[in-house]
């Protein structure tokens, strides 16, 4: 038996659909409004776009998928804090090693290319 305060999946799905539609309409209103009011100041239009997009994101955040996305973002931020980032010295050393290996490989490939060009020229008699 379900609790009285729990939403049924159908009503939740319908509410989410309506919220996504409202978020889309708000975002579309930002784009269309920016186009239609092109003669107004850029600052006013930018403020309108920011407000409408913020409202669209706010509405989208109240949906089931929006709440899941916010939860995922919070968990991701916690994981980023756990990462042990390299020091500046380690980063510079690794970068210099990659640069040196890239230069050596470029010289090796250039040499092989030169040898192959000479072999083809020798074989074709050019």
UniProtKB/Swiss-Prot annotation:
Per the record, membrane topology reads: Multi-pass membrane protein
- Main location class: membrane
Q: Name one GO biological process term.
A: intracellular protein transmembrane transport
Q: Which residues cross the membrane?
A: 20-40, 42-62, 97-117
Location(s), subcellular: Cell inner membrane
| GO terms of molecular function | protein transmembrane transporter activity
**Which Gene Ontology CC terms are recorded?**
plasma membrane
User: What protein family is recorded?
Assistant: Belongs to the SecE/SEC61-gamma family.
How this chain assembles, per its entry, is: Component of the Sec protein translocase complex. Heterotrimer consisting of SecY, SecE and SecG subunits. The heterotrimers can form oligomers, although 1 heterotrimer is thought to be able to translocate proteins. Interacts with the ribosome. Interacts with SecDF, and other proteins may be involved. Interacts with SecA.
Q: What is this protein called?
A: Protein translocase subunit SecE
Which organism was this protein described from?
Answer: Vibrio alginolyticus
